[in-house]
């Protein structure tokens, strides 16, 4: 599993800038989906062969006891507890502040390794900038510049050095491996116990079971499944929804390890931004998705209609997923949930023949050609499969950069219907045929066209006339001389 690195520090020390540097992006979130710009930002990065996850926490105000800043501080402490390593960022220009000392005191109590990074150190004397921060007793400071990248590589390299090399990926599971994800108190633990049944009662008292994911293999109607339980499987009588915690980090880690995600919603509560955020994790990771709307038995018919309207309005980007309305406590609707998990897995792992993909593409073009972009009309020639989990279709042709988002959605729906891709995201990539001579030094130079202007023609004509006149004069002179003789 990828190590998780949390960026911590007071406001305006450059956490977001360093985050962008580590993830090599300006925004690692899922486009403009609702709810994805709040709480903690997350992103993926890689140094050499070692991948990692980065969490950009909010500005840490440890002295605030209430309000939104207090909530941000609580989220930051939770991120510290659940991360594998912590980067404590301070401002080299401002110098050491009382807030930095309070944060350092909190971080020294954490069992996670803490790396002190002095940011905004470009152009300065590293030894001088780092000197006063030794007072924090967090080891040798790393003087870096998140904006320019100075020292960032050495920092992340030292962090990842403590983690083992990623093992070669084992042969991918030939059956659904799914994770139950969702915000706190929606009934995830109840659903896990309902899925595993009465005969599978496991209590984990070992340290770390509330932080590490547990893979449990089981069978349902003769079909193999693996469930990833991030909260530990507890006895039915010990499930306490009030204290159940499922953090953003755990959701990320669970989605990374699974090939299908089961998103649990609470029908008794409104669809929240955090629901969309967690759904966005699965969508960005390209995981097949099944949505379970829990506690359906405890609401009125009027409330049910309201929930369906909210889902259509707030989770419109999950139109490919199958929705199930269940009761985990009474184990209602669980069988249908498994059918959709299996179907979503099959769709995510589908192998599509190239001839059929190209035929579907050509028929889609015949029904509706891509619109022109100025004087250019994109021309699509053929397509083939470029990957699985999620399925990727690569389209080849010319001027494909001019294809609009609406036409891409049209192609996505066409391929989804043709191959019955229910429950999985589908990605379309455009591969434009390259001109081998474009921007090449050895590009053959075009010969200039031989064009003779009107003025040149007149000059030549006048020149010929003058030449004829001179010739006539010469001949007349020579004739006179002959006659004179």
UniProtKB/Swiss-Prot annotation:
The keyword Repeat applies. CDD domains: EngA1 (cd01894), EngA2 (cd01895). The gene is der. Keywords: GTP-binding, Nucleotide-binding, Repeat, Ribosome biogenesis. It comes from Neisseria meningitidis serogroup A / serotype 4A (strain DSM 15465 / Z2491). SUPFAM superfamilies: P-loop containing nucleoside triphosphate hydrolases. One of its GO terms (molecular function) is GTP binding. One of its GO terms (biological process) is ribosome biogenesis. GTP 1 binds at residues 9-16, 56-60, 119-122. Belongs to the TRAFAC class TrmE-Era-EngA-EngB-Septin-like GTPase superfamily. EngA (Der) GTPase family. It holds the Pfam family KH_dom-like. Gene3D superfamilies: 3.30.300.20, P-loop containing nucleotide triphosphate hydrolases (3.40.50.300). NCBIfam families: GTPase_EngA, small_GTP. Associates with the 50S ribosomal subunit. This is GTPase Der. Residues 350-434 form the KH-like domain. GTP 2 binds at residues 182-189, 229-233, 294-297. GTPase that plays an essential role in the late steps of ribosome biogenesis. Residues 435-485 are annotated as: Disordered. Residues 470-485 have a biased composition (Basic residues). Residues 3-167, 176-349 form the EngA-type G domain. Residues 457-469 have a biased composition (Basic and acidic residues). PANTHER family: GTPASE DER.
């Amino acid at each position: 599993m990828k190590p998780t690195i949390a960026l911590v520090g007071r406001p305006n020390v450059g956490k977001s800038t360093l985050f962008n540097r580590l993830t090599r992006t300006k925004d690692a979130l899922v486009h403009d989906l609702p709810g994805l710009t709040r709480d903690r930002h997350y992103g993926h990065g890689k140094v050499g062969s070692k991948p990692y996850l980065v969490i950009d926490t909010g500005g840490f105000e440890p002295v605030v006891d209430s309000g939104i800043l207090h909530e941000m501080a609580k989220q930051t402490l939770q991120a510290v507890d659940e991360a594998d390593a912590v980067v404590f960022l301070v401002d080299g220009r401002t110098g050491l502040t009382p807030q930095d000392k309070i944060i350092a005191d909190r971080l020294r109590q954490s069992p996670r390794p803490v790396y002190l990074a002095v940011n905004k150190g470009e152009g300065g004397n590293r030894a001088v900038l780092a000197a006063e921060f030794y007072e924090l007793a967090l080891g040798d400071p790393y003087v870096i510049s998140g904006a320019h990248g100075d020292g960032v590589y050495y920092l992340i390299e030292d962090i990842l050095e403590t983690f083992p090399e990623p093992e070669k990926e084992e042969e991918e599971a030939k059956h659904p491996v799914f994770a139950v994800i969702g915000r706190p108190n929606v009934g995830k633990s109840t659903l896990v116990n309902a899925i595993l049944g009465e005969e599978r009662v496991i209590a984990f008292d070992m340290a770390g079971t509330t932080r590490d994911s547990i893979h449990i293999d089981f069978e349902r109607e003769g079909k193999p499944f693996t469930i990833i339980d991030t909260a530990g499987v507890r006895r039915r009588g010990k499930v306490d929804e009030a204290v159940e915690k499922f953090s953003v980090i755990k959701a990320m880690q669970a989605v990374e390890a699974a090939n299908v995600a089961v998103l649990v919603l609470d029908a008794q509560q409104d669809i929240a931004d955090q629901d969309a955020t967690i759904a966005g994790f699965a969508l960005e990771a390209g995981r097949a998705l099944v949505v379970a709307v829990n506690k359906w038995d405890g609401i009125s018919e009027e409330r049910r209609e309201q929930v369906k309207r909210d889902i259509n309005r707030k989770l419109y980007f999950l139109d490919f997923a199958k929705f199930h309305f269940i009761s985990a406590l009474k184990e209602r609707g669980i069988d249908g949930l498994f059918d959709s998990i299996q179907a979503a897995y099959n769709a995510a792992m589908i192998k599509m023949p190239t001839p059929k993909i190209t035929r579907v593409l050509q028929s889609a073009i015949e029904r509706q050609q891509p619109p022109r972009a100025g004087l250019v009309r994109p021309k699509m020639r053929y397509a083939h499969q470029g990957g699985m989990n999620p399925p990727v279709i690569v389209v080849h042709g010319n001027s494909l950069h001019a294809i609009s988002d609406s036409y891409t959605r049209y192609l996505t729906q066409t391929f989804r219907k043709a191959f019955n891709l229910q429950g999985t995201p589908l990605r379309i990539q455009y591969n434009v045929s390259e001109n081998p001579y474009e921007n090449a030094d050895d590009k053959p130079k075009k010969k200039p066209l031989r064009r003779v202007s009107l003025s040149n023609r007149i000059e030549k004509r006048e020149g010929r006339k003058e030449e004829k006149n001179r010739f006539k004069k010469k001949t007349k002179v020579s004739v006179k001389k002959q006659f004179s003789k």
